[in-house]
Amino acid sequence: MARFVFITGGVVSSLGKGLASAALGALLQARGFSVRLRKLDPYLNVDPGTMSPFEHGEVFVTDDGAETDLDLGHYERFTGVAARRTDSVSSGRIYSNVLEKERRGDYLGKTIQVIPHVTNEIKDFISIGEDEVDFMLCEIGGTVGDIEGLPFFEAIRQFGQDKPRGQCIFMHLTLLPYIAASGELKTKPTQHSVKELRSIGIAPDVLVCRSEGPIPQKERDKLALFCNVRPESVIAAQDLKSIYEAPLAYHREGLDQAVLDAFSISPAPKPDLTVWHDVADRIHNPEGEVNVAIVGKYTQLEDAYKSIAEALTHGGMANRVKVKSEWIDAEIFEREDPVPHLEKFDAILVPGGFGERGTEGKIKAAQFAREHKIPYLGICLGMQMAVIESARHLTDLTDAGSEEFDHEAGKRRFTPVVYHLKEWVQGNHKVERKVDDDKGGTMRLGAYTAKLVEGSKVAQIYGSTTIEERHRHRYEVDIQYRDQLQAEGLIFSGMSPDGRLPEIVEVKDHPWFIGVQFHPELKSKPFAPHPLFADFVRAAKEVSRLV
């Protein structure tokens, strides 16, 4: 049966609970334990699938088609354990489940209340798969004191009471602000945060304190005294140059040992951190630099493309180079010539997105890359824009576009080389969708198999003609235009197994021009860079004349 670590936050949000959880998971793995990480979000959305990227950042999609918080991406990248639908839940999902049960009569006419019905639903979620791993790490979103988070805090308090003594511990992450005028780290906000946590019945076993620099022993002792934790369980979490330093940094601070001590696991297996030393070496000792332009729609918030940024870093590590990314708003190219903006880059990446805004700019970026022989990677919408660009400029389909952008019924503005996907095969059954279906959870989501053309560039990159990648889209390139486009050099090099859905296109006689309908960034890891990103950076490296 698993041991449970509940990770909570205080003082301010966005302190890095997800990274701390992921790093702890990696350290426990390094000691030979199996782990699974979960995220419990207090917001009332059922999932992040319909939330604006500006509100929430990227949506991380799992193999089984769940749309989840970006922290699950950190969990996967640090542990290599594929996340599942049962690793993410929100207040919206919990309340929805409770109300469905009430409508079915499952509660036998009782008055439905937060305690016990909502808290029991949360506890049931936490318990899923508890016999599968040695450690279950559960991160609670938000900060202690948030109204919407109270049912989750109450649920984990009860959970700790329900389990045998020594099977659950609580780790609290806080901020130690530095006051420049006095030259001091202030512990009072952390003391009040722990006081708030204790007032609802949760006493932290481990205290992780974010700070700009080292925490003097005097402050550690003070925190241990006033927060009622052991001095060795006050862990400093200093700002780092790279998130991939976190496992080694937390190990030096003794986080993994503090957790094992809290569980009375002694003697503890020694960690094998070889892989993380190699990762750190590749980050800190690059042999060159490449410049990549990311032409997107949500560039004001880098978290909107979090997995893409990390996958590029992984590609750089595979090639021993530093990837310097510059985010460019695609709308700029709708007003200005893209050449002065793009000619300085070694490669161009156009990521996914929804809606018409900025798409003409993305098309111009694809055109620049194709005509100037610059490596191009188009992901999801980025592939669709590359296909539209080729259709407009290489064939007689000069009005090529996407059904997504034809808003008025009966008034077609484009020849729809990209159409609304209404049916597809998933496993052994057919999935059907209607245009007026709910937006949430109705896209083509999760892992699907693709067949690659033997001898194609992508088949060489993958080293296989069969791949499985994660998808998140409701629009698709129309297969009826394949012959027309292939005659002009746009090769359809990857297809769904039934041959109906284009998955990958590549430009013939181009050094590196690939568009993919799926999201390869979701499966990249620092110790196992995704082959597409590794080869994309290799191509950029050649352009930069580093080879």
Swiss-Prot record:
Substrates-to-products reaction catalysed: UTP + L-glutamine + ATP + H2O = CTP + L-glutamate + ADP + phosphate + 2 H(+); L-glutamine + H2O = L-glutamate + NH4(+); UTP + NH4(+) + ATP = CTP + ADP + phosphate + 2 H(+)
Miscellaneous comment text of the record: CTPSs have evolved a hybrid strategy for distinguishing between UTP and CTP. The overlapping regions of the product feedback inhibitory and substrate sites recognize a common feature in both compounds, the triphosphate moiety. To differentiate isosteric substrate and product pyrimidine rings, an additional pocket far from the expected kinase/ligase catalytic site, specifically recognizes the cytosine and ribose portions of the product inhibitor.
Binding residues annotated for CTP, in chain numbering: S13, D146, I147, E148, K186, T187, K188, P189, T190, Q191, K222
EC number(s) per entry: 6.3.4.2
Protein family according to the UniProt entry: Belongs to the CTP synthase family.
Name of this protein: CTP synthase
Residues that bind UTP: S13, K186, T187, K188, P189, T190, Q191, K222
One GO biological process term: 'de novo' CTP biosynthetic process
Subunit structure: Homotetramer.
UniProt: Mg(2+) binding residues: D71, E139
Residue span, Glutamine amidotransferase type-1 domain: 291-546
Organism: Dinoroseobacter shibae (strain DSM 16493 / NCIMB 14021 / DFL 12)
Gene (UniProt): pyrG
Pathway assignment: Pyrimidine metabolism; CTP biosynthesis via de novo pathway; CTP from UDP: step 2/2
